[in-house]
Regions:
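Conserved catalytic-core segment of nucleotide-activated headgroup transferases in glycan assembly
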Residues: 17-32, 159-165, 172-242
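Nucleotide-sugar donor-binding and catalytic loop/hinge architecture
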Residues: 2-7, 163-178, 328, 345
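Acceptor-binding helix/loop patch of EC 2.4 sugar-transfer enzymes
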Residues: 16-19, 43-49, 94-126, 161-163, ...
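A short, well-ordered alpha-helix in the C-terminal region of glycosyltransferases
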Residues: 307, 314-329, 335-341
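Conserved acidic donor-binding segment of nucleotide-sugar-dependent glycosyltransferases
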Residues: 288-299, 307-313
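Membrane-proximal helix-turn-helix segments that form the acceptor-binding/catalytic region
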Residues: 57-67, 81-89, 99-103, 114-135, ...
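Donor nucleotide-sugar binding/catalytic pocket of nucleotide-sugar-dependent glycosyltransferases
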Residues: 130-167
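Nucleotide-sugar-dependent
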Residues: 20, 189, 227, 233-269, ...
């Protein structure tokens, strides 16, 4: 049997592996792609941009573009002239994104300087969407946006490596139920949507529950006991196993509607039930009263918190259903072959 020819891919990532977006969309896939015969190189965008680092990155990207069969821009939105120059070296470009890059993060949405930067970024985004042979979106909301500019658009949800996310085996009893949240500090503003429900719940449930925040910055909520733990790169699963219920509040904004709900996927992967706002991809990931609860109002948040705090069997049952859904739809083991097929098709185009 003739051996399938190896495909060479260079990933131009927005961040290095310390940031979740690039880690989840690229770095976690690398061993799986390599086992399928791909040769992969990753070139993260420099965190501190100077004239020297900019030129070095440009020359490195052009060299790797000449080496590769496929160039993947992961969330990297840069000047048109650079995209056009790279496209002359290698026109087989894929653009992958997992955020509503046309609008600022909620924490900076009222900053006029940030908004001005995003007005420029939108033009760059539209350009690369039109120039890419293929676009990969993290959810259907993003895919619909990309379809305005690109003819070939695929959806691959942000996914977890099942081998790295073992099921939680030890559960708290009703004496101290831990509701947990893990994420970037700029997303702590999302607790605005759940704050009143949390306050009402803790007013009734008191010291028998707590909220644990895992991030690089703490959170303070009136009337809510919060325990803060500083996030560390290689301790994600340890943090998740310390929760009994995963929380994913979201403000109903354009940016939130474009997010891929990876927090909920992480919770479900280790067998945690989820309480989430019904915004964007959360409605596709969390099945109400099957893998968790969708809560919009303070009353709905309070009820969901109370039900899960009071019923260990319910927590375990919803958590098991969540893990099964992740195994079906949100695992790298399941989605790596889909990514491989797309890359091979672009390489041969």
């Amino acid at each position: 049997m003739r051996r399938r020819q190896s495909v060479k891919v260079v990933f131009l990532t927005r961040y290095d592996r310390s940031r979740a977006s690039s880690r989840v969309r690229v770095y976690d896939y690398l061993p799986h792609l390599q086992r399928m015969g791909f040769q992969c190189q990753v070139l993260p965008f420099p965190p501190k941009l100077t004239s020297v680092t900019k030129m070095r990155y440009l020359f490195q990207a052009l060299w790797f573009a000449g080496w590769a069969d496929v160039v993947v821009f992961q969330k990297l939105v840069i000047r048109k002239v650079f995209v056009d120059l790279l496209r002359r070296v290698n026109p087989r470009i894929v653009f992958d994104f997992d955020d509503a890059l046309w609008t600022p993060p909620d924490a900076f949405s009222h900053d006029p300087q940030v908004r001005a930067l995003y007005q420029v970024q939108v033009r760059y985004l539209h350009h690369i969407l039109t120039q890419a042979r293929c676009v990969i979106a993290g959810n259907y909301y993003l895919a619909r946006y990309a379809m305005q500019f690109a003819s070939s658009v695929h959806v691959i949800p942000s996914s977890v490596d099942l081998e790295r996310y073992p099921l939680k085996v030890t559960w708290s009893d009703e004496e101290k139920v831990v509701f947990g949240w893990i994420g970037s500090p700029e997303n702590l503003v999302d607790f605005k949507s759940a704050q009143e429900g949390l306050r009402r719940f803790f007013l009734q449930f008191g010291a028998k529950a707590m909220l644990k925040i895992v991030s690089t910055s703490p959170l303070s909520l009136d009337g809510v006991p919060v325990q803060f733990e500083r996030w560390e790169l290689d301790r994600d699963v340890d943090f998740l196993h310390s929760f009994d219920v995963g929380l994913m509040p979201l403000n109903d904004t354009e940016r939130s509607r474009g997010r891929c709900g990876f927090k909920a996927i992480q919770y479900m992967a280790v067998g945690l039930p989820v309480i989430a706002s019904p915004v964007g991809a959360a409605t596709e990931i969390v099945e109400h009263e099957c893998t968790g609860f969708l809560a919009s109002t303070a009353e709905e948040w309070e009820e969901a918190l109370m039900r899960l705090a009071s019923d260990k069997d319910l927590r375990m049952r919803l958590g098991r259903a969540g893990r099964e859904k992740v195994e079906r739809l949100f695992s790298i083991q399941g989605n790596a072959p889909k990514l491989a097929t797309i890359l091979r098709e672009v390489a041969s185009s």
